[in-house]
Amino acid sequence: NAKQIQNTYSIMSSRSLSSAKNNILDFAFSSPVTSQARLPDNTKPQLKNEAEPKLDAYEAEIYSTKEDPRRFQQDRDRPEYKSLCYSNSTQSVCTSVEEGQHLLKQVTFLKSSLTPGVIADYFDKLGHLPDDQMESVRADTKFAMLCRYSIENLQQYSHAELIGILKAFVRLEIPATHSMFSVYEVEFCRRVWNMSTNDLLLVADMWRYLGRSVPRYLEILYSYMELRWKDLNLPQLIQLIYIIGEGRKAPRELMQKLESMVLRHLDSLNLEEIGAVCLGFFKSHNGLSEHLMRKIGDKVSDGMDDISNYALVNVLKMFRFTHVDHLVFLKRLGQIAPGRIPSMGSQGIMHIALSCAALHYLDENVMNAVAATIPDRVAYCRSKDLAKLLWSFGALNYQPPNADQFYATLTSQIRNKLGEFEKFPEHFLTCLLGLVFAKYYPLDLIEFALSEKFVKLATKESLFELKKDLFTLDGSVEIECPEYTGNHLSMELRQEVTEMLQSFSRQDICIKPEVLEAATLIESMLGGPQYVKNHMILPHTRSNDLEVHLDVGEKPIPINVDTVGSPSVSSELKPMGIQITEDLLDQLLDSNRKTVLHKDVEKPKLETGQRRVASSVPKDYTKLLNPDFSSGVPITDNLISMLAMSRALPEKPLCKPKARADAFKLAIQVSNRNHYCYASRHLLGLHNLKRRQLQKLGYVVVELPYWEWFPLLKRTRSEKLAYLHQKIFSS
């Protein structure tokens, strides 16, 4: 089964190294650095039964972290890349085994009399030995002696000789952790300002190919490039961005300059180079401007049939990072991706699903293709892939046709990888949240996640995000799985997260203009702030509601403890303006009022700017309002009931409200675009989960959807009151 697949990712040893002059031990005990590939070349995973992925799945999963990001360098129309980057495909005539042995013997004879030129020549020739001889050369003590002699007079080498030696090290696959590389890095750092741009980029490329981190060299290189960025030609620009991405960081000022160069050269870039640009900026945590992303989207949309899967995924990563919604690009993706997904690796598939989820863009054909392909590839999925896939479907609130198979397969693989998930608790919690959004509750996994051991592991760095995830998980299982009797979070942790979320809500959500306007008007309509509570009913769902309780007679019940009996509320409840008397009510209830009102309201004259249906209001909205309504509130029985109710307001402070079994509990939600999938009215996962749980707790969810409420914010107070009255009392 899936858990029997080997983990083909290599983990590099971090053991301490000996000094540069004791290289013999380094070579004796160091094995060649294995490529950090998902599946190393010419190596199949040992499948232990017939249920494992077949050959086609294996071929789709072959990925090299060294070679794949460098595909743009192989463009035949850009021969300039040959002088900027290392390539093992352009080997000259091989050195014979006999000649190699002779060279190593010469080292023992010449010893310290070896000149820099001879040493460089020896390394070059040894680097051209047949591949099957490389391991024996690395293990030879005479080769270790040659390495030791090479670092004794580094300053005497020419630039070309020093670069040639580094190139030989790459061919020989010297372990990146070898101690002599520290000495070589120092020497290259010393020479940066005297080397050409091509040589500097080539050296950086070889360090990357070796897998050696050289932060000091890159720091000086970037300083050099900040002064010469305007002189970069197109291949140099792309190669530099690639190097920056692999180094994971660069000065923001330099990235802004390079972005302007990308914009200048955009028409000349091919699709693979565009993918390299997006990946370089993405890996270094630098976004591209919306203007540039829209131009990139236009170009890739036109050529999407020709772009490689790898470059396409990299472009998607940048759209995800910048949150730019390029609808033409996304629609083209929906046409192309379903046919490509079966031939893509699981990482690429994950990034497509994750990008769609991050952009809140639901394309059912794309997500169906993902769901249909992944069950057969699940053995190749890392913990991160499982997490992002489950989160993507959950966040988009989408159930594919094969939902049961999809979720069962991925859940089973989570169980198989529990050991790996303990190293990455954030991925484990992301998996579970994705499942919970989709209303799947693997109780054994949830119990493990809420165990004291795992909670301690997940919160040891005091990461608020993981605490929030645990809180959401705990609150959800408590509401939706009453049969669950397993672990729960401690009261202390729940209180801590609740307070942090409430603090955020008070500072951000509760004070949004559209929320405040709704709260104020509802308070006015119901008779005071004691009837409306602007808070998070379910803190674990991370958003607020306007809570209102009505009795069976649709009269509001005071619930806001913070305002009940306060001086401010008492003053608000005093009669102001027109005194509501029996005479006034009799006049309002007069049998002739309908005729009078009909004459006054039937055809009101509207001033310019007071038209009832503005262009920003949906056409169907007018059905919600009284068609004869202009600037006043329609006199209805409900309104009269509310007016009459104000006469009975108690003179003494109200007592603390108590929960009533016969009350209607309303959760009024002011939604916005971020609660829905892009350009649709399909609710996202977290917000769907919240409504589901509120309803389970007996609340009636009343939504003020943004497509109705936001246009109304510019309308008259009377129109807003009428809309809110209709929403609340017809719910």
Predicted segments, located by residue:
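N-terminal alpha-helical scaffolds in RNA gene-expression factors, predominantly in nucleus-encoded
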Residues: 1-703, 707-731
